[in-house]
Each structure stands twice: as structure tokens, then as C-alpha cells.
Amino acid sequence: MSIPELGKKIKVTVPSTTANLGPGFDCLGAALDLYNEFIFTRIEGGGDRFDLIMESTDGNHLRGGPENLVFRAAQKVWESANMDPFALEARVKLAVPPARGLGSSATAIVAGLIGANAIMNSPLSKEKLLELAIDIEGHPDNVVPSLLGGLCLTARSSSQRWRIIRCDWHDSIKAVVAIPAIRLSTSAVSYTHLTLPTNC
């Protein structure tokens, strides 16, 4: 598989999500119509170069490095496709507030997977991208609706394969989001996965 030509661009728009709905701890989540936008460009340089430029809704510009989730997700695509890494730039317009429970980390993971895959002419299937997304995030409730849209229930089958059920979202149900003033990252609350029973 050849490395994409310099200057090739891919635009990816990923929705925010709400998860842990009702009894669906770690397995039931829904996409919301608030989006982060990612534009990936093949740039000069080796696979260790990843330029991430983020513009938040308040106009602030932030930069990220190779430790960023977008880059980590792109690396998973290269590894799975047996592809040598190449230099990428990602310009991100952030509308989803980070560390507020709206799946901002899931948008980064899904965008990195879709963007890296698409810029290489999609060697990996959507099913493989789903597996990679869940593996990176650690649980499916945010990344699955972020990738597929809608309301999704995700669980492992007896054969340990992921099974996804798309649920109807009734027109009478409206999402209302209250964004807290405090920031709380996914990693900061990961202890709940150790103290609560596994439902899915």
C-alpha cells in the first residue's frame, strides 16, 4: 500500500455523545448534534511527525503532540493495515467541551481512526474501526454512537464478539445538556469501572 500523496486532505465531522443512559452502564449511549470537526492533511516528514492544531469555540488555539488521542488512534490504523506511519497534520475545530461528559475523547478517537483510514483509501472495514475504537477507549458506550450515530446498545456475545443494537429514538424525546463548571476527565473517573459491577 502506497503512502498518500502530499497535500491530500480528509475532513471528518464527529458528534458528541451522552452515555451510561438509564441501566446501560458502559453499554448504552447516544449521539448528539454537537460536533467536532477534523481536517487531516498529509504533510512532509516521517511517521513521528504529527501536527495537531486545535481551535476551541472561544477562539483559543491549542497544540497537541504524539501523545494525543487523535494520533494514537491513527497509529492503530497504521499498525492494523501494516502501513508505515507518515506525517499528518490535524486541524480541529472544537465545539464539544472537553472533560464535561459529552464524549470529547470519543470524538478524538473516532476522528483519528476514520481520518487515517480514509486518507489511505480505507483499507480497514467499519467493523475493524469499531473494534479499534472500543479497544482504545476501554468501553463502547461513547465511541460506538460517535462512529455510527443514533442510540446504540453494545455488548459482547457469547463468542466475545461485539454486538451492536441500533435503538429507535422517539421523536418526543429531546436531549437537554447541563454542562458543569468543573472539568473531569475520563481517566479521573475510571475507578468506577473497578467498583461497579460489569453489566455488559
Q: Which functions belong to the PLM regions below?
A:
Residues 34, 179-184:
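Glycine-rich beta-alpha junction loops
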Residues 124-174:
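Alpha/beta catalytic cores of group-transfer enzymes, especially the acyltransferase/condensing modules
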Residues 11, 37, 151-153, 175-177:
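Conserved hydrophobic/aromatic beta-strand scaffold that supports enzyme active sites
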Residues 188-190:
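Acidic, proline/serine/threonine- and glycine-rich low-complexity intrinsically disordered segments
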Residues 34, 102-124, 146-152, 157:
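DPxDG-like acidic metal-binding loop motif
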Residues 1-100, 114, 118, 122:
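ATP-binding N-lobe of GHMP and related small-molecule kinases
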Residues 193-200:
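Single conserved hydrophobic/aromatic residue that forms the stacking wall/gate
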